[in-house]
Amino acid sequence: LKVTELADRLFISPASVVRFCKKLGFSGYSDFKASLRMDLFEPEETPRKSHPTDFFRDIHKTIEMVPEETVERIVELIHCSRRIELYAVGSSSMPGSELAKRLQTIGKAAFCYDDSTLMNISARQLTSDDLVLALSISGETSLIIAAATVAKSRGAALVSFTNLGNNTLSGMADENLYVNATNFVCSGIPVQSRVQLLMLCEYLFFRYIETYGDCLLYTSPSPRDSTS
């Protein structure tokens, strides 16, 4: 339900809905909706035995949590930003790296960092013309939070990609996208998929070229990139 639709049903303005959400402690209507979904979903504190179809359930829940109005604002931030820096570590770095490569093919200055030193060097060079996309399932990855804090102090906009729920990174961000990433146990090994992050990154890219495709410079990836 979009904010305009809710406002129409309540016979108030969209701005009144947003103000009410902020009074409740949320950054806006999108965060309020995400928190409401979190309350409706049964939390899973410990890993549980999984079935292959459980991953599809997580993907479906993630799709349900994508607010189009938030995506539109992030797409605009990507378009208007001088540089786009992606911060991600571990398994989350692959989706970030893929998004950076895709943005580079259309002429955007996009770079992905998975090293704390490089993240902090990057963050110290940013300005209010730049954008940081920070990927952390937990939203509590200390390396990313430290770099994001520096980037925010420099005036850069911050978009977080985290698991559904309250966390430090989403609380810092200007815009938030959430995934549903359940902890599973496969053959005694804890597993948490990152395919939802990759899906969100892919969706953002395709929404971007759908919106701004007519004014983009496309550069074909090198044979080395296409075979990697």
What do the predicted segments below correspond to?
Residues H79-M199, Y203-G213:
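Glycine-rich phosphate-binding loops that contact phosphosugars or nucleotide phosphates
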Residues P67-T70, K152, L216:
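Residue-level recognition of alpha-helical structural elements
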Residues Y218-D225:
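Conserved small/polar residues in nucleotide/adenosyl-binding loops
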Residues L1-R73:
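HTH-adjacent hinge/linker in prokaryotic transcriptional regulators
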